[in-house]
């Protein structure tokens, strides 16, 4: 285990976090929130000093292997979260540290679940930090590190694979550092377009900025106690469109940028993703015409917003879907689990994995009928390697294991099954709101510190595709090798 290299990269993450904290500090100064500004600046200074000291000298031995790559990813997200929670705690706005950690982990993992009943009491500076954490976590913090700290020797790809969502990470350009830069360029441009669109729709500047960060990262933290209900239907429609756009694999945008139109528009995963959105929107709208009670267009609008919000794992809400018909709630639970496309800022299992699982099931049925047949699974016009199919099955087993254990652990708090099941669905899949006592107009403060710790783990595991978090618990991970 190359501990010196792990500490070196963790320190770089601290430096980036320290610089990032200067933005909410400036925001707090502008709005004359002096206690929040002092708390934010102290954490920023500490991060920059500690980071600078630990990165002063690069380790002599830079070589590391897959297990170090996973530990680096998990460690960086833990450090980022534990330090990122301090402004909330030091300022006194969130008096319990476990709650502050829950809130910022929800931010960085782009979950959007909250323990706050009065968001506006945080003040503008901390609301900005809370929303900006969505944007930082959306594309991946270590992807950003790779743009400023290229490691070479294949180590970049090792880290990128461990952090990036989806069954496979393909390099868009030959060098991984250039891939990271290309991703962030697309991400930044789309975010700017998103914020400008919100401004043109009539949103105040601060709202457009924070909602833009949440939409781009597919996060979902509301900045008002009323959620998204205060904004016009046109603004809500634009939010839906951009949530869906950020839920598409960024490789598609890279292909569009390179004018490879045929490859971009023939993406099987993107077409399936959009088809799921269309079918789910129509079903929920017609299934809830009576419950919504304001006509078909009203039902279509709010169904479209909710479907876009849930499948992309953003978690914004305009209506309380706790009051919708049960079949619609079942569709919402399915969307929570399926998630967006691989290589997007969205969470969940990912549409590409569902496609592979369904095709693998079809292959097995075909082989039962035709035992001598040779049938390969294809995705995006390419024949999939056996290891990719196997990794999807392994991921699903790990996913179900963590899911069941988590529901069991939080059940000791005594809440009903729907609340517990949807709470884990919401946190593990990085959604935000659940059903029943953790629905769109409720929050997660009802749970004990232990259950919050379980959900903190789930949010991190969901964002990091499970294995980087699980590997921390293996004794073999920490054994020294010669």
Feature locations, PLM:
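Membrane-proximal intracellular helices of multi-pass ion channels
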Residues: 1-482
């Amino acid at each position: 285990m190359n501990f010196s290299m792990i500490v070196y990269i963790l320190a770089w993450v601290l430096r980036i976090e320290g610089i990032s904290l200067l933005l909410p500090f400036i925001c707090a100064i502008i709005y004359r929130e002096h206690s929040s500004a002092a708390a934010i600046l102290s954490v920023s200074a500490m991060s920059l000093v500690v980071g600078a000291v630990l990165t002063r000298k690069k380790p002599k031995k830079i070589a590391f292997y897959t297990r170090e790559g996973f530990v680096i990813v998990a460690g960086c997200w833990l450090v980022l979260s534990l330090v990122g929670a301090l402004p909330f705690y030091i300022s006194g706005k969130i008096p319990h540290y476990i709650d502050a950690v829950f809130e910022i982990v929800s931010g960085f993992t782009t979950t959007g679940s909250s323990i706050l009943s009065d968001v506006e009491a945080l003040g503008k500076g901390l609301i900005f930090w809370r929303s900006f954490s969505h944007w930082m976590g959306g594309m991946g913090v270590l992807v950003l590190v790779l743009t400023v700290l290229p490691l070479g020797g294949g180590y970049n790809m090792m880290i990128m694979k461990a952090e990036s969502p989806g069954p496979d990470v393909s390099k868009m350009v030959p060098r991984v550092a250039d891939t990271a830069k290309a991703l962030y360029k697309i991400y930044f441009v789309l975010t700017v377009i998103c914020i400008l669109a919100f401004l043109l729709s009539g949103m105040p500047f601060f709202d457009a900025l924070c909602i833009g960060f949440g939409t781009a990262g597919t996060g979902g933290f509301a900045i008002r106690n009323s959620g998204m209900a205060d904004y016009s239907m046109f603004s809500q429609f634009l939010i839906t469109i951009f949530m869906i756009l950020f839920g598409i694999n960024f490789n598609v945008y890279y292909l569009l940028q390179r004018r490879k139109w045929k490859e971009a528009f023939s993406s099987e995963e993107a077409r399936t993703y959009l088809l799921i959105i269309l079918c789910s929107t129509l079903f929920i709208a017609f299934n809830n015409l009576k419950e919504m009670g304001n006509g078909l267009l009203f039902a279509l609008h709010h169904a479209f917003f909710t479907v876009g919000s849930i499948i992309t794992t953003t978690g914004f809400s305009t209506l309380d879907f706790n009051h919708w018909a049960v079949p619609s709630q079942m569709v919402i639970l399915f969307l929570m689990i399926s998630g967006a496309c691989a290589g997007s800022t969205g969470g969940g299992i990912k549409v590409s994995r569902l496609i592979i699982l369904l095709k693998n099931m079809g292959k097995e049925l075909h082989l039962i009928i035709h035992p001598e047949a040779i049938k390969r699974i294809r995705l995006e016009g390419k024949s999939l390697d056996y290891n990719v199919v196997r990794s999807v099955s392994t991921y699903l087993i790990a996913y179900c294991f963590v899911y069941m254990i988590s529901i069991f652990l939080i059940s000791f708090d005594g809440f009903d099954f729907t609340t517990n099941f949807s709470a884990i669905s919401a946190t593990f899949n990085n959604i935000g709101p659940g059903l029943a006592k953790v629905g769109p107009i409720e929050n997660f403060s009802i749970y004990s510190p232990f259950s919050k710790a379980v959900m903190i783990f789930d949010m991190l595991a969901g964002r990091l595709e499970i294995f980087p978090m699980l590997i921390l618990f293996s004794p073999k991970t920490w054994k020294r090798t010669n």
